[in-house]
Amino acid sequence: MSDELKHIAIVMDGNGRWAKKRGLPRSMGHKEGLNTVKRITKAVSDLGIPYITLYIFSTENWKRTEAEVGFLMGLIKQHLKAELKFYADNNIRIEHIGNLSGLPQDIQDEINSVRDKTSAYTGTAIVLGINYGAHDEILRAIKKLNSDELASINEESFSLKLDTGKIPPVDLLIRTGGEKRLSNFLLWQSAYAELYFTDTLWPDWTVENLYEAIEDYKKRNRRYGNA
């Protein structure tokens, strides 16, 4: 296996706490978090890293207040519409993982529209985890299998049934905000990922912080089970 960095995944944690520290509503933290998304994805694109997957909205996030969920859905839709020029200027294409059918119809339509409009771009792919949970993803993949496939299934063929399909496994998984857990994010794809945890809240995370995480990754010895 190559140690070349092909796929970064990020659990973007800390928006709410960032806002609370400043006496602001949680919504302001989410808005500020989008600014971080733009600068980090631009940096990843400039570095020529093929994939970055962002944990935008989990299957568990529906447990939040109706007002916050509604705000987040609106923010996602607004962001996708507003950034088409950014994607074009940077040759970025958008992909989606998660249970698309479980999202409001207007969000489904916007995701499909942006995915179609950016599909010809050949640079970095931003993979948006929206209504995503690894357990849900794996269960949906199992349900796609017919009896013949089930009898001959192996790791490679099962991987293709997952939302990520042919996207390479995660090399570096970053979590901001101080927590040290995966939170049901890309469990199958992160089997051999290097984990990087930082106390910095997502809205405060900088391009320099990204470079530090990548430099730390480069120093790791990835053995993949070997001695």
Curated annotation (Swiss-Prot):
Family label: Belongs to the UPP synthase family.
GO BP: polyprenol biosynthetic process
GO MF terms, alphabetically ordered: ditrans,polycis-polyprenyl diphosphate synthase [(2E,6E)-farnesyl diphosphate specific] activity; magnesium ion binding
EC class (word): transferase
Gene3D superfamilies, per the entry: Decaprenyl diphosphate synthase-like (3.40.1180.10)
Top-level taxon: Bacteria
Positions that bind substrate: 14-18, 26, 30, 58-60, 62, 64, 175, 181-183
Cofactor annotation remark: Binds 2 magnesium ions per subunit.
Protein species of origin: Treponema denticola (strain ATCC 35405 / DSM 14222 / CIP 103919 / JCM 8153 / KCTC 15104)
Keyword list, A-Z: Magnesium, Metal-binding, Transferase
Residues the record lists as binding Mg(2+): D13, E194
Subunit description: Homodimer.
EC assignment: 2.5.1.-
Name the UniProt record assigns to this protein: Isoprenyl transferase
Cofactors demanded by this protein: Mg(2+)
Function summary: Catalyzes the condensation of isopentenyl diphosphate (IPP) with allylic pyrophosphates generating different type of terpenoids.
